[in-house]
Curated annotation (Swiss-Prot):
Region of interest (Disordered), residue spans: 1-20
A single GO cellular-component term on record: chaperonin-containing T-complex
Similarity comment: Belongs to the TCP-1 chaperonin family.
Subcellular location: Cytoplasm
Species name: Kluyveromyces lactis (strain ATCC 8585 / CBS 2359 / DSM 70799 / NBRC 1267 / NRRL Y-1140 / WM37)
GO biological process: chaperone mediated protein folding independent of cofactor
Coiled-coil ranges (or none): none
Superkingdom as given in the UniProt entry: Eukaryota
Lineage of source species: Eukaryota, Fungi, Dikarya, Ascomycota, Saccharomycotina
Protein's recorded name: T-complex protein 1 subunit delta
Length: 530
């Protein structure tokens, strides 16, 4: 009897264990990241202290800031950092919520995988549940107008309530609203936050933070040659060339034999500098902003002497990345060569002066006359030390982003976990009318959304089981705005308690979390390239 030829083994394709193990490892890694920042959610959330590789200390409870600084090695865990970053760009707030939600949805997916449901079916059902969730959120939101300043301030206050600076929210929230409204028009659908410049100065307290309608420079006016420190009806020039004698190449040397030649060099130098200064004065410029130079002195003492004699105020060492903002704000064009220094390239302002505030000097440019449609504002942030300043800047940025969200999508919803419980209740109700696997998946998705109110209650020291059960009951009775009020240490109508957030924060978080989970579930192997 002829022995049968041995068939090639198909076991490699039948190995179902590996994809399951990979998925399990991915879910564990992602959930570990979510659990790490879970304690920093909400007004009673804790802060994290981070020591960077350079030895700097950061204290923050902003989800994106914490994750960005964490040394994360697992590639799937890095996806959560990117999701947090995407939420920061899209909405500016809710960066912690989106990561916690992703972790909870992955936990739900793990339960479903253990029941033997295919990952693609889970991912697609999650996506459909997310779309339905967004519809529910938009239906329960309340439309607002940009004229309703009180509603805007309340939304900004809710964002600030979880930060270190929460006790200053009564002062910082209106400041954030004023900043955004001063650069946004009624028909605008977006706000470029680059038009709001945040400047940090150590000294004073957070209450000394102020908004300046105009431009603030951290550099001081040059006083060494007795130049002016206040100019009215200013004509401002922004230059990128140097007002100092040109240097020879490194290989070349100049040999001077006698003093007459030395005299000639000095005379030449004086004539060269005087010629530049006269051209600047001829263009009717009386305030000169000089960009920092690496090659040689941006402006030397002799040039400063000539400029002060001509009554021109000089501010030097303007950073390269400030040039674009200054030219946009002041309406002046950067000038790269003295031959191009003409009157039409200058900007105009009512007053440019150096003022002393809380022990340090700043230069303020107010009453800017520009043809630019988009005005700009500056905010000088004050604080006791750099850590406080950095966290105040991050908190203020979050508040500005919340107002920007309301310019994009002019609708508010209740905060304190109310929208998540409402969406969870509605999805659960709809899941009961479905058939097959989809019903299972929607139920798990709905349950996972309850992680936000559960975490809020845990962080506030409440009994999360009792609180969430009570909230479910209230929502079943039609109280769709019932959420957790930390001030009352229990449940209440958070909309009436003025705990508000833009609808865009919640819709964006649900969309991004569901997309991230979909990506993670579709991965069945990790290979490392050479």
């Amino acid at each position: 009897m002829v022995s049968q030829a041995k068939q090639p083994s198909n076991a490699t394709f039948k190995n179902r264990e590996k994809p399951q193990e990979v998925r399990k490892a991915n879910i564990i890694a992602a959930r570990a990241v979510a659990d790490a920042i879970r304690t920093s959610l909400g007004p009673k959330g804790m802060d994290k202290m981070i020591k960077t590789s350079r030895g700097d200390i950061i204290i923050s409870n902003d989800g994106h800031t914490i994750l960005k600084q964490m040394a994360i090695l697992h590639p799937v865990a890095k996806m959560l950092v990117e999701v947090s970053g995407a939420q920061d760009v899209e909405a500016g707030d809710g960066t912690t919520s989106v990561v916690i939600m992703t972790g909870a949805l992955l936990g739900a997916a793990e339960k479903l995988l253990n029941k033997g449901i295919h990952p693609t079916i889970i991912a697609e059902s999650f996506q459909r549940a997310a779309e339905r969730s967004v519809e529910i959120l938009l239906n329960m939101s309340t439309k607002i107008s940009l004229d309703d300043k009180e509603a805007l301030v309340r939304a900004a206050s809710t964002s600030l309530s979880s930060k270190i600076v929460s006790q200053h929210s009564s002062f910082l929230a209106p400041l954030a609203v004023d900043c955004v409204l001063s650069i946004a028009s009624h028909d605008s659908t977006n706000v470029d936050l680059n038009d709001i410049r945040l400047i940090k100065k150590v000294g004073g307290t957070i209450d000394d933070t102020e908004m300046v309608n105009g431009v603030v420079l951290t550099q001081n006016a040059v006083k060494t040659a007795g130049g002016p420190t206040r100019i009215e009806k200013a004509r401002i020039g922004l230059i990128q060339f140097q007002i100092s004698p040109p240097k020879p190449d490194t290989e070349n040397n100049i040999v001077v034999n006698d003093y007459r030649q030395m005299d000639k060099i000095l005379k030449e130098e004086r004539a060269y500098l005087l010629n530049i200064c006269k051209k600047i004065k001829k263009a009717k410029c009386n305030v000169l902003l000089i960009q920092k130079s690496i090659l040689r002195d941006a402006v030397n003492d002799l040039a400063l002497h000539f400029l002060s004699k001509l009554g021109i105020m000089v501010v030097r060492d303007i950073e390269r990345d400030e040039v674009e903002f200054l030219s946009k704000s002041l309406g002046c064009k950067p000038i790269s060569d003295v031959e191009l220094f003409t009157e039409d390239r200058l900007g105009s302002a009512d007053v440019v002066e150096e003022v002393e505030s809380d022990g340090s000097n700043i230069v303020t440019i107010t009453g800017v006359k520009t043809t630019n449609k988009n005005p700009t504002v500056s905010v000088v942030i004050r604080g006791a030390n750099n850590m406080v300043l950095d966290e105040t800047e991050r908190s203020l940025h979050d508040a500005l982003c919340v107002i920007r969200c309301l310019v994009k999508e002019r609708a508010l919803i209740a905060g304190g976990g109310a929208p998540e419980i409402e969406v969870s209740y509605r999805l659960m109700k709809e899941a009961r009318t479905m058939e097959g696997v989809e019903a299972f998946v929607w139920q798990e998705y709905a349950e996972a959304l309850e992680v936000i109110p559960t975490t809020l209650a845990e962080n506030a020291g409440l009994n999360s089981l009792n609180v969430v059960t009570e909230l479910r009951l209230r929502h079943e009775n039609g109280e769709s705005n019932s959420g957790i009020s930390v001030r009352r240490s229990g449940t209440s109508n958070t909309y009436e308690d003025h705990i508000l957030q833009p609808v865009l924060v919640s819709t964006s978080a649900i969309r991004l979390a569901s997309e991230c989970v979909k990506s993670i579930l579709r991965i069945d192997d990790i290979t490392f390239s050479r």
